[in-house]
Amino acid sequence: MIGILKTSLQNNDKDFFTIHNINKLTSTNTTSCIFCDNIDPNFILPIKATVLQRANAFDFRGMLITDELVRAQDLINITYPKKRFLYLYHLEWPHITELKFTHIQRILLNDNIELIARSNSHAELIEHLFKKPKYIMPEWDYKTLIEINQNE
């Protein structure tokens, strides 16, 4: 089972592709759910997967994936997931003023968190700065999510 950990779902490209591909998973044998605290009432897509409060992620035992650096700090403290992944969808860390490089290192070099890159060029940069991403997944591709679920 794949769990997606998010603060909220907003009308942006990242969340659109998240839900678009999670919805595609509902017609496969790969089960999924979303842990988040807020969904924009004007969110453009219907959500076909189970949505739970973010606090429920602390009891989750499947593959847990987040695409938010802030939530990746939670991944370090969530005890039960089978595997933890940080999907670096946007390389946004230079633009987050309150996030220091030491915080980023603690997350991106953590042995318990695997990295997922959005493209080959992102993967090369991430590997050069931190460690090699385990997967490359363009725009939350549901086929890659199935592969992660099967391989891990």
Predicted regions and their residues:
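A polyampholytic, Gly/Pro-enriched intrinsically disordered region
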Residues: 107-113, 152
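Short internal beta-strands
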Residues: 31-37, 87-88, 116-118
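A short, active-site helix/loop in glycosyltransferases that binds the activated sugar's phosphate group
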Residues: 74, 111-135
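Extended catalytic core of nucleotide-activated donor transferases of GT-like folds
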Residues: 41-109
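N-terminal pre-catalytic "stem/leader" segment of glycosyltransferase-like enzymes
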Residues: 1-60, 145-152
